[in-house]
Curated annotation (Swiss-Prot):
Its EC number is 5.1.3.9. Keywords: Carbohydrate metabolism, Isomerase. Belongs to the NanE family. It catalyses: an N-acyl-D-glucosamine 6-phosphate = an N-acyl-D-mannosamine 6-phosphate. This is Putative N-acetylmannosamine-6-phosphate 2-epimerase. Gene3D superfamilies: Aldolase class I.
Amino acid sequence: MLPQGLIVSCQALPDEPLHSSFIMSKMALAAYEGGAVGIRANSKADIIEIKKEVDLPVIGIVKRDYAHSDVFITATSKEIDELIESNCEVIALDATKQTRPKESLSELVSYIRNKAPNVEIMADISTLEEAKNADELGFDYVGTTLRGYTSYTKGHILYENNYQFLKDVLAHVNAKVIAEGNVITPEMFKDVTDLGVHCTVVGGAITRPKEITKRFINAFDK
């Protein structure tokens, strides 16, 4: 089980300056030394390097684009196989209602349970309906990761209306809830923790210096 507290997402995509499994492993080490209780990471290669560097549970994902589908976070059994080989403790996958490229969500849950019964599963959702569905499918964790990132939730952010969406998810699912997405300040981390989430994933605000720099620069463009 993931411990309660702060999980730091250490990811860099191919077009980003820090794209390197070695660099991500050092980013994870810095997060560990700062007090993180877990890491979220993208790709088998990154996870293997991170696990050499820190003794923390890892939420693993594989981001891969597929034609005719907007699902790109651990979209098929191919990505799940890679994550099982990485020995990550938790596999996270897109649990939205978007059209999937191959297997159904329920088929993927069964696939993980059968192939890796000791691995926990996290649902990345964007709506309350998706959270409830993930809960019914038996996910161990439900995360608000994709709120604002699906076509039908675009424009929404986690902290709008005093975190009402997060409050609704907490009230309607039995799975442990993970706050993720647009948690960009220590105060927000405290806010969502006080609401009762099991843990919180923070990425861009900690591990993406290019984006952090842009936020400072953009302050002058408004």
